[in-house]
Amino acid sequence: MRLDDLDVALLTALHDRPRAGDLELSRVTGVARGTVTARLRRMEDAGVVTGHGPEVDVGAAGFGVQAFVTLEIAQGALDDVHRDLAAIPGVLEAHATTGSGDVLCRVAAGSHEELQQTLLAIDRSSCVRRSTSVIALSCLVPWRTLPLLHSSVAERARRPR
């Protein structure tokens, strides 16, 4: 789905005011409430907007030790390792990747000892052939999407029609 200026304006307003309703968003963006409702529904249906729940800072919630784990897995074992990783609470996300590893995981724990237990649980998967981990010392750029969305709209505006 290609996002236009209004879509990005709505996403920016939602980012700045996560609890805003359609009426407030219509005031902020200067468009009719029905337009806001229709645009948000369209973005939800397309999978652009995936939820309205709170963003949780795992560090502030007591899980300040975070690491990235690269896994090399058995040939054809992606579905099995997906199942195994999904069962481990400390695995925040896992991505199939290209390069030297097959899967990249982000994990969190409350202490180094808990991190070790999470890493051991990952290694217990029969699909994992090798794992390497690095501990994150700090987050330099937190998860974000708005700069990418704004640059996309700006790039399209610069193109000749």
Q: For each predicted feature, which ranges?
A:
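A compositional/biophysical signature of low hydrophobicity enriched in polar/charged and small residues
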Residues: M1-R161
